[in-house]
């Protein structure tokens, strides 16, 4: 007697197929009517990995106002999955982004005030952050999200002392898993300061927030507020930080000679604090 063929629960099957690029999935939509129906499921389409069709950006005049720029290879003439106006937020402005999620502030009329909202522009899912005393524009409010763990996000409030030239006095951390704010006194040295514009270039990697300070060092804090660290700079002035292969990278642009500027890429490959120069290139060669 032959054994019955094992089948997967529909919920599990949808979860698996949602991780397959949609174009690859649709190559098999002629297998059967049920498969064609599955490929036409709008919810599955929204969750499937998409070919990059564009990106959000601010302007030099108003960085809080978002624009959506299409790539030439985008789906020309078709309605985009993402509405760049984010109409469900009912006004407000962009504050920060991380891993495909946006942190926006929305103005409320009753009572008058501001709500901070974390939203996924691809799915139009959004969450209002609970109010806390330090959740205000005078402080630095940042988002942490790892697409490899899409079930949760983190919000950070970098608390500044307005009477002491913006010195950092503490950090408040919100975990979407617990829906609770946790307040921590700063574990960094006194006189640690971060500009608001520098904070926009923050990095969330391996469960840790990275910030460039006014003295061009990098300070870090984990989502539990337990591990605080300062990483010395490898070069006098860093332009931006980022990650590749789960390693911290920094980019510096320095005046090279009469021919132009030199772009340098440094990488921190372990916790030793030693930087390695990976790449250098004259910017004129990239144009």
Predicted regions and their residues:
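N-terminal entry/capping and adjacent linker segments that precede and initiate structured domains
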Residues: 1-287
